[in-house]
Amino acid sequence: IPECFRIEEELKRRLRKPVMHDDQHGTAVVTLAAIINVCRLTGIELKRSKMGQVGLGAAGSAIAKLALAYGVGEVMVTDRNPAAVAPLVAAGAHSTELDTLLQRADIVVCTTGKVGLIKPEQVRRGQVIFALSNPYPEIDPDVARDAGAAYAADGAAINNALAFPGIFRGALAVRAGRIDSQMYIAAAEAIAASAGSDEVVPSPLSTTVHDAVTDAVSNCATALGLANTAEL
């Protein structure tokens, strides 16, 4: 189990300040934003869809947890480490083998670090594949599309720089003492809404998206009662 989990939880316990591990939550937020928009573009009904998360390290675990919190129809997970799978199953995910996941999932997200893990013949026609390992993905997006994927992207396209500036700015603007999962969802929805009609996510160089994330996170923190308005 990654040590970052324990470190983040301990910092949250000790500090009355917002704490966020970007490799976990920044990646999860941008991935959720991309999933929201790719479903819009491909006609997949997200709340009824089957999503498969391959690899449950820091990023993969956070992606699966946020997908569950958002209400994705079914979240399937697979990892060679049973200790990584157990917390996700307890949260509502279904544990499965890789081959079964690839056969059943409408949306496949990979964060394994294993180049070439997914073979072209394993891609199901109409599937969405986010192969996010850097610098080399589990399957090249062009190869996945040629094999029948409706959409495919790698880690360069799903950039967590879209998330963390606005999340922190939004939390700090209202003196929030912590960052709640609903604030991450608000950030993901703001990123998704900032994309163009034919985009899955906007450019991280867009100032508009960072302002939108800031406002969404601040408003969400206030609605949740997490804003420390006495200090504003």
Protein language model features and the residues they cover:
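Gly-rich Lys/Arg/Thr-decorated short loops/hinges at beta-loop-alpha junctions or inter-strand turns
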Residues: 9-19, 46, 84-90, 104, ...
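Glycine/serine-rich phosphate-binding loop and adjoining beta1-alpha1 elements at the start
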Residues: 1-49, 168, 172
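Glycine-rich phosphate/diphosphate-binding loop of Rossmann-like nucleotide-binding domains
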Residues: 25-113
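Predominant activation on well-ordered alpha-helical scaffold segments within soluble catalytic domains
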Residues: 5-12, 29-36, 64-65, 89, ...
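Adenosine-phosphate binding glycine-rich loop
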Residues: 20-24, 42, 131-231
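Rossmann-like adenosine-cofactor binding region
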Residues: 91-152
